[in-house]
Amino acid sequence: VIITYPLVIMSEFITHIFSSKKQQASVSREEVSAMVNVGAEEGVFEKKENSMIQNLLKLDDISARDIMTPSSVAEIAEESMTLREFYRNEAFRQFSRIPVYNEENDDYIKGYVLRQAILEKLAEDKFDLRLSDIIRPVLTFQETDNVSKIWERLLAKKEHISIIIDEYGCFRGIVTMEDVIETMLGTEIVDEKDRVTDMQELAREKWQQEQQQNHK
């Protein structure tokens, strides 16, 4: 909450300036950017604040595809999996929210589960419950949707995770609240459990390794 509060305030301010499509905006994004730069030069804004506001102004130009964790490296769970099976899978332990896919088609994400909810059910000895019993609905966006739209929807719905799909509805990646905040700050938020900081780079490396294996 402490981290996101100033971002929410600035985001709402900038959104308010440009939200009306019926009325001509009195100030353009370029003018706001120029004013912020002048403010930074005169000491009104610190360098980090200037950078953050500039990033906020660019959110409409950044797509989900640019910041998402690609599906090829995302950890997802099958809906028929029991809570016992889920808990035994170490790959899920570092994530608080895990997308759940249809058992007949892993390109179709049905929702997500909260790790905390699973731990609570396990504490009640409900080991044989399935993920489908506790699944939650998840927000979905197109690969081409901009980050500003994703940010506003996540805030409005009080959600922290969203699924990115292509034009056919197939799973292409994940964008979290953390991803959007990192984009705003212009820096990566590294958790103590994070092992890979650039998931898109990891996806490229994984694809290259698969191609090399196929050509042997």
Language model features: what each stretch is:
Residues V1-Q23:
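Alpha-helical transmembrane segments and adjacent TM-loop junctions that form the membrane-embedded core
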Residues Q23-K216:
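Soluble cytosolic regulatory domains appended to membrane proteins
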